[in-house]
């Protein structure tokens, strides 16, 4: 899978790029995904506008629906926005690495682009198992502090 990583924050994301590329490279997906690191203010703006929830969240996914809505061929799976600040706080709270939190959020966003949801317990468990599998491929686990 092809990913493009964009940084719209003042934080240095260079240490996380190789992990993210390594994590998504083996996934058999021919479309491009954009991972965009943003500020809490930006993600709150997006969350408010698109979901009518006026607070910052950790990750938002926006699938590319051009093919569906307009019948157009496009090579983009969609965009995943990650709040770097939110990831830092969540990693500290959960007592695991920022690397693991960013990887988790990126995978979570990717699965939403692929159509997975977690509205029910069954959907949640399916999504959790897929996240765990992808994270384990790069030596990260959901239940460990790494």
Curated annotation (Swiss-Prot):
GO molecular function, one term: metalloendopeptidase activity
One annotated GO biological process: rRNA processing
Entries under InterPro entries matching the protein: MetalPrtase_cat_dom_sf_prd, YbeY
Parts of the chain that traverse the membrane: none
Entry's localization field: Cytoplasm
Cofactor(s), by name: Zn(2+)
Enzyme class: hydrolase
UniProt remark on cofactor binding: Binds 1 zinc ion.
Keyword Nucleus among UniProt keywords: no
GO CC, any one term: cytoplasm
Positions contributing to Zn(2+) binding: 108, 112, 118
EC numbers, comma separated: 3.1.-.-
Pfam entry (one): YbeY
Keywords carried by this UniProt record: Cytoplasm, Endonuclease, Hydrolase, Metal-binding, Nuclease, Ribosome biogenesis, rRNA processing, Zinc
Protein family: Belongs to the endoribonuclease YbeY family.
Function, in words: Single strand-specific metallo-endoribonuclease involved in late-stage 70S ribosome quality control and in maturation of the 3' terminus of the 16S rRNA.
Protein name as catalogued: Endoribonuclease YbeY
The species this protein was found in: Onion yellows phytoplasma (strain OY-M)
The encoding gene: ybeY
């Amino acid at each position: 899978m092809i990913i493009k990583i964009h940084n719209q924050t003042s934080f240095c994301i260079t240490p996380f790029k190789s992990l993210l590329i390594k994590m998504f490279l083996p996934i058999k997906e021919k479309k491009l995904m954009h991972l965009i690191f943003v500020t809490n203010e930006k993600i709150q703006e997006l969350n408010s506008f698109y979901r009518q929830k006026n607070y910052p969240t950790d990750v938002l996914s926006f699938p590319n629906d051009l093919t569906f809505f307009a019948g157009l061929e496009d090579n983009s799976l969609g965009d995943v926005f990650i709040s770097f600040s939110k990831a830092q706080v969540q990693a500290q709270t959960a007592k695991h690495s920022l690397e693991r939190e960013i990887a988790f959020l990126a995978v979570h966003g990717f699965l939403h682009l692929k159509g997975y949801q977690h509205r029910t317990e069954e959907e949640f468990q399916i999504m959790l198992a897929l996240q765990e599998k992808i994270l384990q491929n790069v030596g990260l686990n959901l239940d460990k502090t790494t």
